[in-house]
């Protein structure tokens, strides 16, 4: 079999429905829109939340909560993820970004969490550390510095 022998499966390619091309086509005159009314007009139809004049569900439900602008949002990195670095290397948010451990530096920066084990001495510079993460970094012979 060669590339020029390849054909799509039967009925795999559906033809586009061309409407409004004469009554003989079967899709002429009203073009499948029915006769008159809001939905027959161009730009017609109702918005997704419209329920025919009945009070919509989103207005019946109470407002709840708020977004705290002072909330601290960190990128969370576990201790075991730092094993990707070489012994004695300095770990910064920029280097975590380079290695693909984080996607982007969050609003409040990077926080190191204590899940897993660290088997290398590293100098870790981050915006926050959990108590267990700091202990594990120092137990491996490294340093945990808050930036």
Swiss-Prot record:
Family statement: Belongs to the universal ribosomal protein uL15 family.
Task of the protein: Binds to the 23S rRNA.
Ranges annotated as biased composition (Gly residues): 21-35
PROSITE patterns for the chain: RIBOSOMAL_L15
Keywords, ordered alphabetically: Ribonucleoprotein, Ribosomal protein, RNA-binding, rRNA-binding
Entry annotated with the keyword RNA-binding: yes
The protein's name: Large ribosomal subunit protein uL15
Any one GO BP annotation for this protein: translation
Subunit structure: Part of the 50S ribosomal subunit.
Organism field: Halothermothrix orenii (strain H 168 / OCM 544 / DSM 9562)
PANTHER family (alphabetical): 50S RIBOSOMAL PROTEIN L15 (PTHR12934), LARGE RIBOSOMAL SUBUNIT PROTEIN UL15M (PTHR12934:SF11)
GO molecular function, one term: structural constituent of ribosome
Matches recorded under Pfam families: Ribosomal_L27A
Region Disordered, residue ranges: 1-57
GO CC list: cytosolic large ribosomal subunit
Keyword Ribosomal protein among UniProt keywords: yes
Biased composition (Basic and acidic residues): 1-11
